[in-house]
Curated annotation (Swiss-Prot):
The gene is surE. Belongs to the SurE nucleotidase family. It catalyses: a ribonucleoside 5'-phosphate + H2O = a ribonucleoside + phosphate. Keywords: Cytoplasm, Hydrolase, Metal-binding, Nucleotide-binding. It is found in: Cytoplasm. The lineage of its organism: Bacteria, Pseudomonadati, Pseudomonadota, Betaproteobacteria, Neisseriales. InterPro entries: SurE, SurE-like_Pase/nucleotidase, SurE-like_sf. This is 5'-nucleotidase SurE. It comes from Neisseria meningitidis serogroup B (strain ATCC BAA-335 / MC58).
Amino acid sequence: MNVLISNDDGYLSEGIAVLARVTAEFANVRVVAPERDRSGVSNSLTLERPLQLKQAQNGFYYVNGTPTDCIHIGQSVFSDFQADFVFSGINRGANMGDDTLYSGTVAAATEAYLMGIPAVAFSLNDASGRYWATAEQALWTLLAHFFKNPPQSPILWNINIPAVAPEDVRGIKIARLGRRHHGQNVIPARNPRGEQIYWIGPVGEVSDREEGTDFGECGAGFITVTPLQIDLTAYPDMAETAAFWHAD
């Protein structure tokens, strides 16, 4: 089996090294990742300039583009490697709730899913760098189960690993997406020339961390698995919308 691996933190990140190392014990691996951190770019494509594919000394390939670009490159240019699965991550920081709309990590998996390839996004609910041992141990558990009976149809799973010691991981829970409050996150500043500039600041606080959500269960020490879908149609609103637009 062949697994294409990407991320949004870049090919030099600790998370992608862990993901590639563990996955290589179960399958053939090829890494195609952005050359630098592309967090928050979602499913964007690079359309205004050409892309370059290069190979690093560690064997990883990197692209001067987005995670979505990397999936297209990875599936298009290698005659000797066609992915059976796509793994994205391990992201340095959670991708839960609304985060999934912005995440390049989730976007790489989403793009693969749109191509008909089963895909999984992995994230660690920590940005301090203290819990990579937990992430690696969790990954061994997850992939041993995954490859024992691999999914046969396209799936899109979002997995978050808790920020606890390896021995304190409480198991795996299937969870729905939670929600964040919208952050007031535009921060004004001045550049060295005195010109007005703006920074996009931190995300908002979590507003839905109830039991059964990814925020709630991962915060309680569980690995969370959330099945995602691409169809954004609000089916319960179809009749009401039709009544509005078809009214005399």
